[in-house]
Design a protein with these regions (language model features):
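Short secondary-structure boundary segments
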Residues: 11, 36-38, 79-82
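Beta-alpha-beta core module
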Residues: 3-4, 18-20, 63-100
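Secondary-structure junction motif
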Residues: 15-16, 29-49
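Short beta-strand-to-loop elements that line the ligand-binding cleft
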Residues: 33-35, 52-64
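Conserved functional loop/turn residues at catalytic and ligand-binding sites
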Residues: 25, 30, 50, 72-73, ...
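Residues at the C-termini of beta-strands that transition into short coil/loop
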Residues: 1, 11, 35, 95-98
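Flexible hinge/capping segments at coil-to-helix
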Residues: 1-31
Length: 100
């Protein structure tokens, strides 16, 4: 079984009302890329779309990423399984690419 990746963004993000989040929009925001775990899979999403995210600093751990997103420090992508029962105030959306 393959776990889908989901965009995670602050609840007050201007695009949080979209049904699905465009991968291209992730490159217009500070992107919180995990240093371990799902880094290769997430990097592959950008490579497939020929995009380069703006990663302002290394981020360790899903909880740190979720807390930073909740605080408005950036957006991220995490596996759907991680996001099933998050205690953080953040919006999650499926991803799509206009370039695919």
């Amino acid at each position: 079984m393959r776990d889908s990746s989901m965009a995670i963004l602050p609840e007050d993000h201007p695009l949080q009302d979209l049904e699905a989040f465009p991968v291209e929009a992730l490159c217009k925001e500070p992107f919180l890329l995990p240093e371990k775990g799902s880094k290769a899979e997430i990097s592959g999403i950008f490579e497939h779309s020929r995009l380069t995210p703006h990663v302002p600093f290394p981020t360790w751990g899903n909880d740190a990423i979720l807390s930073m997103v909740e605080s408005g420090l950036g957006v991220s992508v995490l596996p759907q399984l991680v996001l099933r029962r998050i205690p953080y105030r953040a919006a999650t959306r499926p991803l799509f690419s206009r370039l695919s």
